[in-house]
């Protein structure tokens, strides 16, 4: 089924350059998808809304590549197989999220330990604000495996948790359908807020001056490095029992996710922790 375009494009079949630039900074991350057809259908859902940064997380790179070449994936992509050909691969979710300033995890199940929970509208608005303030940085939308969804550890690797408003008596939503809903609303928000026009102006040298730029936020890679160092410090100091670490890392992640660390703050805490580790010997 074809729908008439809501906005004019520079060339027939293309979004305006400003809109393309914004949508290119949204990474769509599928964690251990089990069915090739769902990956293909997800590619179609993304292409029809103008997104094209498709990521697969799978420790088995050969299996991930095979999934993209599967006839079911190509058939379900229905013309979006170019997204399958250009799809990115990461060995772990942490690796996939390294450059991202914000990651929204989509799950219906509440957990004991989870990042701050947001409605779909709140989460996408937060992502939109970061896309506006930091015109080079990416954000990520993260979806778990079809049967079990995201694990607790995968969930804690993300910045925020979002759910979709569905029938509580029947909340089962296909992976590609969930992606389609989120992609549509995010595209709509980008256009409604005029972010595509801002990106167009920045591309023509009309962006904000360097002096007016916001402070650099810590990407996921810096935050992950800080978590590792703090855990090493807790072990070296005797504060943490290696045989019973409990939920120490989860608590750290939950604490940090309540705010958005600046890059210099993350480096300060990381450097201080490393120095203490050296002195502990």
Language model features with spans:
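Post-transcriptional modification and biogenesis factors for structured RNAs
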Residues: 1-281
